[in-house]
UniProtKB/Swiss-Prot annotation:
<comment type="function">
    <text>Has histone acetyltransferase activity in vitro, with specificity for histone H4.</text>
</comment>
<dbReference type="GO" id="GO:0048471">
    <property type="term" value="C:perinuclear region of cytoplasm"/>
</dbReference>
<keyword id="KW-0012">Acyltransferase</keyword>
<keyword id="KW-1133">Transmembrane helix</keyword>
<keyword id="KW-0808">Transferase</keyword>
<dbReference type="InterPro" id="IPR016181">
    <property type="entry name" value="Acyl_CoA_acyltransferase"/>
</dbReference>
<feature type="transmembrane region" description="Helical">
    <location>
        <begin position="58"/>
        <end position="78"/>
    </location>
</feature>
<keyword id="KW-0472">Membrane</keyword>
<keyword id="KW-0539">Nucleus</keyword>
<protein>
    <recommendedName>
        <fullName>N-acetyltransferase family 8 member 3</fullName>
        <ecNumber>2.3.1.48</ecNumber>
    </recommendedName>
</protein>
<comment type="similarity">
    <text>Belongs to the camello family.</text>
</comment>
<dbReference type="Pfam" id="PF00583">
    <property type="entry name" value="Acetyltransf_1"/>
</dbReference>
<dbReference type="GO" id="GO:0001702">
    <property type="term" value="P:gastrulation with mouth forming second"/>
</dbReference>
<dbReference type="InterPro" id="IPR000182">
    <property type="entry name" value="GNAT_dom"/>
</dbReference>
<dbReference type="GO" id="GO:0005634">
    <property type="term" value="C:nucleus"/>
</dbReference>
<feature type="transmembrane region" description="Helical">
    <location>
        <begin position="36"/>
        <end position="56"/>
    </location>
</feature>
<feature type="domain" description="N-acetyltransferase">
    <location>
        <begin position="61"/>
        <end position="217"/>
    </location>
</feature>
Length: 228
């Protein structure tokens, strides 16, 4: 296991942070594609449409072309929500990380480094609801490079965010993640985050029945247990 350390974001980190964020998001496209591929409705279409065309035309070429068209369409459907999310982030909070996350005592952005390389990112920001801004801190953009998974970096970064939240007087840390982000979801739940609800981010996510999962972590005694 390579040594690593966690520190606050610096201006010189921007390119590496964006690259790590984009690579992490792109990984979910293939997971979404596999998930959609195994849905009963998808299997019915992938089998039914080519079979119908073959029975109607007797052409294997038409069967091949229709199957390829359906698979490409499925890939584009899997890709669209993640590309939309990435573009939204790069044009909003991550367009100016210092202004968004480092201009207030109640927000922060951290990076993890290992042997001079950027291997992880995580950020926290008060929720937008004015009534909850001094109660709930939102955890965002947790990502660990593929080569450094299972080294405890993600857990350490989440713990850093939770400790920051407690020091700043927040009582809850909340986040939203996709049900298709299996490793992240398992990590959060193993650290004590509890599911509070779910919603569909796009029409495509509703179509494929893959909601976003809302999680909450209650601080104070729970954080003391985590430290031990």
């Amino acid at each position: 296991m390579a040594p690593y350390h966690i520190r606050k974001y610096q201006d010189s980190d921007h390119r590496s942070v964006v690259n790590l964020f984009c690579r992490g998001t792109e990984e979910h496209i293939s997971a979404s594609f596999r998930y959609m591929l195994l849905l009963p409705g998808t299997l019915l279409i992938l089998l039914g449409v080519p079979l119908t065309l073959f029975l109607a035309s007797g052409s294997w070429l038409l069967v091949l072309l229709s199957t390829l068209t359906l698979l490409v369409s499925l890939w584009l459907l899997a890709k669209y929500p993640w590309e939309k999310y990435t573009a939204m982030c790069l044009h909003s909070d991550m367009a100016d990380i210092p202004r968004t996350y480092l201009s207030s005592h109640y927000s922060c952005f951290w990076v993890a480094e290992s042997r001079g390389q950027m291997v992880g990112i995580i950020a926290v920001l008060p929720v937008k609801d004015p009534l909850l801004q001094r109660k709930q801190l939102q955890l965002r953009h947790l990502s660990v490079s593929l080569e450094h998974r299972r080294e405890g970096i993600g857990r350490a970064m989440v713990r850093t965010a939770l400790q920051f939240a407690e020091m700043q007087g927040f009582s809850e840390v909340v986040l939203v993640t996709s049900m298709l982000q299996y490793a992240a979801l398992a990590l959060y739940q193993s650290m004590g985050f509890q599911k509070t609800g779910e919603f569909f981010y796009t029409f495509v996510s509703r179509l494929r029945n893959s909601p976003m999962i809302c999680l909450k972590y209650c601080l104070t005694s729970a954080l003391n247990d985590l430290k031990t």
